[in-house]
Regions:
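Loop-helix junctions at membrane interfaces
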Residues: 1-189
Length: 189
C-alpha cells in the first residue's frame, strides 16, 4: 500500500516543485529582478531556479526551467533592448547555454553532493556558454556595438565574464546552498 501511494505522490511533488521554480523564473524574467543592467550588459540571477531544479528534481526539470530562462532572454532582447541585444535574438546564445546549466549543475551535484559546487559549475556554464557563443558567432559585431576595437573582442568578453561572472557565482553559491538546504529539510518533514 505504502509503495503504491509513494509512487503516485512522487510525480505530484516533482510537478509542484517544477511549477514553483518555473513560476519564480517567469517572475524574475518579467521584472527587473532577473536581468540586472550593468551598463549595456545585464547580470542575472535567473540561473538560480535552474540550478535548484537540477539539485532537487534532476536534469529534465532543470532543462525545462533553463528553456524558460532562455526564452525570457530573447523576450528581454526584444522588449528592453540595449546595443548588444541583437546577440540574444539567436537561440544558440540565449537558449542553448541556459538549458545546459541544468545538465552541468545536476551532474556536478550527483558527483560531489555539494550544492556550492553545483551552483558554481551551473553559473559558469551560463557565463562561459553565453559569452563563448557571443564570441564565436558575433565577436567583432559585439565589440563594435560597444564602441570597442573589433580586434579586442576576446579581451572585452573576458572582462564582462569577470565583471558579471564572479558576483553571479558568489550569489549563486549563497542562494542555492541556502534554498536547497531548506527544501531538503521540508522534504524530510
Amino acid at each position: 500500500m505504502y509503495s503504491e501511494r509513494a509512487k503516485s505522490i512522487m510525480p505530484v511533488r516533482k510537478l509542484v516543485v517544477t511549477g514553483m521554480l518555473a513560476g519564480v523564473s517567469i517572475l524574475l524574467g518579467s521584472t527587473p529582478l532577473g536581468f540586472i543592467p550593468i551598463g549595456p550588459a545585464k547580470a542575472t540571477i535567473m540561473h538560480l531556479p535552474v540550478i535548484i531544479g537540477a539539485i532537487m528534481e534532476g536534469p529534465l526539470v532543470a532543462i525545462g526551467i533553463g528553456l524558460i530562462f532562455g526564452v525570457f532572454s530573447m523576450i528581454q532582447a526584444i522588449m528592453a533592448p540595449t546595443v548588444i541585444s541583437f546577440v540574444f535574438l539567436n537561440p544558440l546564445v540565449a537558449v542553448l547555454p541556459r538549458m545546459l546549466i541544468g545538465l552541468t549543475a545536476y551532474y556536478t551535484y550527483k558527483m560531489t553532493k555539494s550544492a556550492a559546487a553545483s551552483a558554481t559549475i551551473g553559473t559558469l556554464t551560463n557565463t562561459i556558454g553565453v559569452l563563448g557563443m557571443i564570441y564565436m558567432l558575433y565577436g567583432a559585431q559585439f565589440a563594435a556595438a560597444l564602441g570597442q576595437d573589433q580586434g579586442k573582442a576576446a579581451a572585452l568578453i573576458l572582462g564582462i565574464a569577470t565583471t558579471n561572472g564572479i558576483p553571479e557565482v558568489i550569489v549563486a553559491v549563497i542562494v542555492v546552498t541556502a534554498v536547497t538546504a531548506a527544501l531538503k529539510r521540508i522534504r524530510k518533514a
